[in-house]
């Protein structure tokens, strides 16, 4: 279960795991922006499962208390058999205009993205990210 937001509207620092359904229930409504981004995420998660993505970290204002988030930042870790006959993430960019997707080179790179690059806001305030369990 995802923890509550802090006084700044962020999840507590760290990587918080949840399933797709919990992510949708927690963050998927409340504004037209959230609804559109959620539909793109649902499509993205289906592609990620089919393409052999091993891990997915979701960040950005989507996983905050912000009513109308601008976009969704994502970092993925491909599995050994990626892309399993699916188009690659780069080839799908136009399919998800509200998602900004980065591809980690390995587990260490994913952790760095999650905790260092995504783990603070513009004011260097620590915040959490969500790992979606596919």
Give short role names for the model-derived ranges:
Residues 1-55, 59, 63-69, 78-134:
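Catalytic core of pol beta-like nucleotidyltransferases
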